């Protein structure tokens, strides 16, 4: 039965992994036996997630009390390179408004529990509001959330149909609620949908006397938390002679009671009045054509200064509208219709770029090892809200700005993200043995730097994402920028949040110049962690060209052919992106073709390269690696995701640098095989067989968030990649020298990994001994007896 349940789980949720396992097992004369053992070894759905999901389903039917605590928290401030997202935190539940790329990563760093998230509200079906939804959905599924309700604009739910080819969310039920369904209400609050329409559409619809609410691409929300029941004052009950027992419950529930002596005690005499729920509004006007719909909508009137009751006036309005709209006189007029006491929070480009302290903390510590390889990241200060908006109580919302609705109504900024470079450096110096290792590194690297002083400054390799599967606070998912020269760069893969990483590394607006020099994007395969950042990057490049006054030429994107249906669906359901790039099928770039295809030759000429080719690797279907050679003869090979692959070895022969995935440590070779990934030693071996002058390891499992386990196979031609690491040819001899200092810098984390590895080895040895033990052999306990 256990094997059957495992098989059912894989058939339902991991069909691709099942096919790979079957191929691994069925390759010899003992296929039946091997397949039997294979099924027995298959993983079941994680027990903890399964139990949590069952508990959550059961808990949904149980009555819940009204929340005593409600806080609005800015998770993504909407500044340059940052997502924009509002998180509503209550005692029993969480609610999210918009989910841009990088939201999941910020939630992880800032310890925002996602296990209680079941409702996400979208203000506009633009990629900037929902680009982080696929990754977040995978995370909440894995932690046992049974159902996710999506609220608002049309077609938002289509995202899950679009991602079905590379993302499995079968254990997560997706429910869409439309404006026509009426207000949403649960134990915490009631949310009224307010659809907004373009001016022309709105005018025609109103003349006809009807409007398709479910067809709206923009929706505002009026949120009213339920009243908090009044408190029972036990002192007053004692004074009135109410005995302990069920009568107290009756009074608490609002019912008058008669005491045994005939005295009538009214509930209102011993229970304080209910506390009304403070109203908050979430709104976005993405462009001028929606402005009239906002101004003319009567739904807001009852929550502005003209509200019939003071408690109905909005206490806070959260604006996702861009600065270009908020600065229009008509929008300012709408803001001033609210009471002067209403707080207005702007989640847009008024904010600064700082949203994560973790990435800066890591970079400040690594900067001590080499200021050129690990340059400090850029932080742009908030641009500031114009005076007329400030006078209307509008302020830029920074990450972790909070507005407390209950209890103690008010704005809180004590938790806003700040940096403390001195503390980060002090942490590094406090690491055992770090000072000694750093001195040794400086002495050794000085000699190496002199030896390589004549090396060229280009190409430059900037690692933007070095993690596999999901982003973490220290490592983002796959992306590598290669600056071929000052005026030309290419991008290898483009995982979620790649644009955010670029802004941190280059700063704003310098990042615009980098985007303008982007000559090509190479996507190795269509797993989520390798391409979900593409749409945001393409849009940012378009804005950069416009800002710099340059021609808006589409950029070539080489990818598997299924990229075209994906972007076409984005065109139809969200926003047009296909005109921003020209598609090149990776199959047309294959290295082993007798004569180069026209697309390959054109791309080589455009990039002024000597050669550029793709190679099929051993991962999922249509997974590719790439090789490129500059006019000067410098050769780079990029593996993408793969297990050791002979074709990659042949295609990359003689490479100056091999960038190879090393998802797992050597002791997880079996797991790496089943998931078609490579271990560190396997990646190093590929580099050796290829004859690569240097091998750079990347794409680490998040279990190695700080530093991968360094095996005996590491040598003078092997380096380990980190996010925001800049590597030039002259830096290559220095990279292997970093390992002793890195192990000291992350000593606690590294020792923890070593202990886990030792524990796994002991368990394997014990299991091996148990299998070899003959039946009936007395145990040690019996023998001693």
Please name every model-derived segment.
Residues 114, 124, 129-130, 140-210:
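Conserved, well-structured beta-alpha core segment at the onset of a catalytic domain
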Residues 24-67, 85-89, 180-462, 479-484, ...:
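Metal-dependent phosphodiesterase/nuclease catalytic metal-binding core
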Residues 725-726:
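Canonical P-loop GTPase G-domain recognition
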Residues 1-29:
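N-terminal chloroplast transit peptides
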